[in-house]
Regions:
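Glyoxalase I/VOC metalloenzyme domain signal
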Residues: 1-12, 16-38, 53-119, 132, ...
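Conserved catalytic-core motifs of GNAT/GCN5-like acyltransferases
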Residues: 38-42, 122-127
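Short Pro/Gly-enriched beta-strand edge/turn motifs at strand-loop
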Residues: 44-51, 117-121
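A short acidic, often aromatic-flanked loop/helix-cap motif at beta-alpha or helix-coil junctions
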Residues: 45-47, 127-130
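A cross-family detector of function-defining hotspots
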Residues: 127, 135-136
Length: 168
């Protein structure tokens, strides 16, 4: 039986689907001291492609990225469109939606996932300054009780829409 070798990598990110990303960030900062949070709008033109079950889609999500130690926390507010996030909210409510694994080569990781029997539910990419960066959510919940996201980080990121707390 083939297995997904990317699962032998460390978890780099924990992703939460939240109702209001600004309020959630404020709570993390005020109650736990977690910050600085970098906000991005995941929609075109930042994302160069967006697919849901293999078909092009449009969605808009407000994302905040922060760190708890070495682990990146991603807070996601679905603003518009049918996505894996709205699927999660319908099934589970708000909360931990995925675990993210950083991969050096997305093509190789996706081939590995397919060999192990996993397909891409939703993906997007092109969010780096050089048009690189790619994320792909896999249909792992059926076996692992959570969705795994493969993340090939961009070499350089765009400046965030905002940072919380604001720099003095």
């Amino acid at each position: 039986m083939a297995y997904a070798s990317f699962l032998n990598r460390s978890i780099g990110q924990i992703g939460y689907v939240v109702e209001n990303v600004e309020e959630t960030v404020k709570g993390y900062y005020e109650k736990f001291g977690i910050g600085n949070w970098h906000f991005y709008t995941y929609a075109p033109p930042l994302l160069k492609f967006q697919n849901y079950y293999g078909k092009p889609i449009y969605y808009n999500a407000r994302i905040a990225l922060g760190y708890f130690g070495d682990t990146r926390i991603e807070l996601i507010q679905n603003v518009e469109g049918q996505t894996i996030y709205t699927d999660f909210i319908k099934s589970h409510g708000y909360g931990v939606q995925h675990l993210g694994i950083y991969v050096p080569d997305m093509g190789e990781a996706l081939r590995d996932a397919a060999t192990a029997g996993y397909s891409v539910v939703m993906e997007g990419g092109g969010f780096g300054l050089d048009g690189d960066g790619h994320f792909a959510y896999l249909d792992t919940e059926k076996d692992c009780d959570i969705t795994y996201e493969l993340i090939q980080r961009p070499k350089r990121r765009h400046e965030p829409d905002m940072i919380y707390p604001a720099k003095a």
